[in-house]
Amino acid sequence: MDKLADLNYTLSVITSMNDTLHSIIEDPGMAYFTYIASVLTVLFTLHKASIPTMKIALKTSKCSYKVLKYCIVTIINTFLKLAGYKEQVTTKDEIEQQMDRIVKEMRRQLEMIDKLTTREIEQVELLKRIHDNLITRTVDVIDMSKEFNQKNIKTLDEWESGKNPYEPSEVTASM
């Protein structure tokens, strides 16, 4: 690991890259030289910049691991987007957050189902009581003395002048 930050090691890597690039240039049929050179340059820069940064970040704080992890995931997702892929790499923390959100939603729905089930049970009990109250019971003798309509009944003989007071009479109107 100490070789990564060493100047001589860096120069030897640059020299080997230059030798590789010069051998590619000598081939006249090489049409993708600029693309290969830019990719190699980016990879070398990432290699040289990320290793010492990771060392320093890991030594200074404990949360730097998460920061580096998110940086690496972002870089990988960028490469995937450049390559045309729609899929993305996710970290374990993001998956855990999504799982927590799903579990919360499931708990909320279970509580709602529990409340609805309790209400339905109460409604069934209420309907049973109403049904029990509506069931007709057979009675042998009906006592009509307690009926309101039966107290003031008069027969035709008991009416004054023997005439039904509820029958309409003829009315003469002047014009």
Swiss-Prot record:
It comes from the Viruses. Gene3D superfamilies: 1.20.5.430. Its main location: host cell. The keyword Chaperone does not apply. InterPro entries: Rotavirus_NSP4. Keywords: Activation of host autophagy by virus, Calcium, Enterotoxin, Glycoprotein, Host endoplasmic reticulum, Host membrane, Host-virus interaction, Ion channel, Ion transport, Membrane, Metal-binding, Secreted, Signal-anchor, Toxin, Transmembrane, Transmembrane helix, Transport, Viral ion channel, Virulence. Glycans are attached at N8, N18. Residues 1-28 are lumenal. The chain crosses the membrane at residues 29-51. The N-glycosyl content is primarily Man(9)GlcNAc, with a small amount of Man(8)GlcNAc. One of its GO terms (cellular component) is extracellular region. It is a single-pass type III membrane protein. It is found in: Host rough endoplasmic reticulum membrane; Host membrane, Host caveola; Secreted. Residues 52-175 are cytoplasmic. GO terms for molecular function: channel activity; metal ion binding; toxin activity. Coiled coil: none annotated. GO terms for biological process: monoatomic ion transmembrane transport; symbiont-mediated activation of host autophagy; viral process. Belongs to the rotavirus NSP4 family. Binds 1 calcium ion per tetramer. Homotetramer. Interacts with the immature particle in the viroplasm. Interacts with host CAV1, early and late in infection. Interacts with host integrin ITGA1/ITGB1 heterodimer. Interacts with host integrin ITGA2/ITGB1 heterodimer. Interaction with microtubules blocks trafficking to the Golgi apparatus. Plays an essential role in the virus replication cycle by acting as a viroporin. Creates a pore in the host endoplasmic reticulum and as a consequence releases Ca(2+) in the cytoplasm of infected cell. In turn, high levels of cytoplasmic calcium trigger membrane trafficking and transport of viral ER-associated proteins to viroplasms, sites of viral genome replication and immature particle assembly. The secreted form acts as an enterotoxin that causes phospholipase C-dependent elevation of the intracellular calcium concentration in host intestinal mucosa cells. Increased concentration of intracellular calcium disrupts the cytoskeleton and the tight junctions, raising the paracellular permeability. Potentiates chloride ion secretion through a calcium ion-dependent signaling pathway, inducing age-dependent diarrhea. HAMAP family: ROTA_NSP4. This is Non-structural glycoprotein 4. It comes from Rotavirus A (strain RVA/Human/Venezuela/M37/1982/G1P2A[6]) (RV-A). The lineage of its organism: Viruses, Riboviria, Orthornavirae, Duplornaviricota, Resentoviricetes.
